[in-house]
């Protein structure tokens, strides 16, 4: 049995090996917007935003005013991309980041928030209409929803990957809204519930973050269907926010059907970035979309890189076959989440991976993957 020193040396060697196999980072002379550049961190260009973001970004779900000190350490180590949303801790995530920005400086980080209530509000409105309909019409709509979900391919086991308990229910709710919009869309005040909701959400985020602009805004937050992304009111709100100087670039996030949603975002033209589920389990479904994103300069940030192969908070237990897949792809003593992040960072079409880092130990561990590749 190896000694502790031997194990640490073996682990360090494994980490160095993982770093060596990453895709090429942006060179020091790369054009674009640099923030918080540190010699121990690698950066990649986020599509046509021009932002040079750290290869590992800070997930915001665990951040709060009383839980943000480790984020200060991450900034000191070169991390420069913060992800958050109003729904994280009911605004506490944004408030926690505000303390970091105040301590380290707004010009050192890229801030991304989202419009968390957009799709939830839309689904609520259509569910209320659905509940008022006669039983035969409800039956027809349910049948149409099932057909559309099955034909979309979004339910394939390795594609949907089941990252959280209500993922399939969210897809069903979004699909019901899509189907109902074709006949009952006129009952919705789209200006109020689609466009104005976005404007109000951004004002709230700016207030909680203590800033007057976002570098990136994602809407919808957790899109489930391509139809959700196509609403013209989203583009109209984006343009108002851009002209007001409140948001610089726009994106979308998606756990479910990430390829379909990414391709739709590319086709629409007003999206400069997307944060989608990318991992060793769903990767085979994403090739065409990732290629198109690179050609269109739509920056891709990977989330849920580790969720299919690691229990995380304990609410998900990955299958042995999935764990074995990442162990074989990235051999050695690294922890499974690190292997999952390292594997995704091999893909040059991905700008960064998002990691939920809840303490200083995880910051040091995970940011080690973003170290520059060895020369030669």
Q: Where is each model-derived feature located?
A:
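Generic structural signal for well-ordered alpha-helices
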Residues: 43, 71, 94, 98, ...
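Conserved, mostly hydrophobic/aromatic
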Residues: 46, 58, 82, 97, ...
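Active-site beta-loop-alpha junctions enriched in small/polar residues
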Residues: 61, 87, 114-118, 219-222, ...
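Short catalytic-loop micro-motif centered on adjacent basic/acidic residues
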Residues: 57, 81-88, 248-252, 273-276, ...
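Active-site mouth loops of central-metabolism enzymes
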Residues: 56-66, 184-197, 326-332
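N-terminal binding-site loop/beta-alpha segment at the start of enzyme catalytic domains
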Residues: 2-171
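Glycine/proline-rich, positively charged
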Residues: 135-273, 284, 288, 346
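Structured C-terminal cap/extension of enzyme domains
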Residues: 8, 14-17, 80, 99-101, ...
């Amino acid at each position: 049995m190896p000694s502790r020193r031997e194990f640490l040396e073996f682990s360090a060697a494994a980490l160095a090996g993982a770093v060596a196999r990453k895709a090429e980072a942006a060179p020091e002379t790369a054009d674009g917007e640099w923030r918080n550049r540190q010699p121990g961190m690698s950066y990649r260009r986020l599509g046509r935003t021009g932002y040079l973001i750290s290869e590992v970004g800070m997930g915001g779900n665990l951040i709060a005013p009383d839980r943000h000190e480790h984020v200060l350490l991450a900034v000191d180590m070169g991390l420069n991309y913060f992800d958050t949303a109003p729904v994280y801790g009911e605004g506490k995530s944004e408030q926690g980041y505000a303390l970091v920005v105040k301590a380290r400086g707004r010009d050192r980080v890229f801030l991304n928030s989202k419009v968390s209530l957009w799709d939830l509000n839309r689904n609520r409105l259509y569910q209320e209409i659905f509940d008022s309909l006669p039983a035969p019409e409800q039956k027809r709509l349910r049948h149409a929803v099932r057909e559309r979900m099955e034909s979309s391919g979004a339910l394939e086991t390795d594609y949907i990957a089941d990252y959280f308990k209500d993922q399939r229910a969210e897809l069903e709710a979004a699909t019901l809204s899509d189907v109902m919009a074709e006949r009952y869309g006129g009952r919705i005040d789209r200006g109020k519930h689609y466009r104005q909701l976005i404007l109000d959400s951004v004002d709230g985020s700016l207030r909680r973050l203590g800033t007057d602009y976002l570098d990136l805004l994602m809407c919808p937050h957790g899109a489930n269907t391509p139809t959700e992304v196509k609403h013209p009111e989203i583009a109209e709100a984006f343009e108002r926010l851009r002209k007001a100087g409140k948001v610089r670039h726009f994106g979308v996030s998606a756990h479910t059907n990430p390829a379909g949603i990414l391709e739709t975002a590319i086709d629409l033209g007003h999206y400069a970035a997307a944060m989608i589920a990318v991992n060793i389990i769903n990767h085979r479904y994403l090739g065409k979309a990732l290629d198109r994103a690179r050609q269109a300069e739509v920056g891709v940030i990977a989330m849920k890189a580790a969720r299919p192969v690691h229990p995380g908070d304990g609410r998900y237990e990955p299958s042995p076959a999935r764990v074995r897949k990442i162990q074989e792809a990235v051999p050695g003593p690294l922890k499974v989440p690190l292997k999952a992040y390292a594997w995704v960072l091999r893909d040059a079409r991905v700008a960064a991976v998002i990691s939920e880092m809840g303490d200083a130990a995880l910051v040091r561990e995970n940011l080690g993957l973003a170290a520059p590749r060895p020369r030669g």
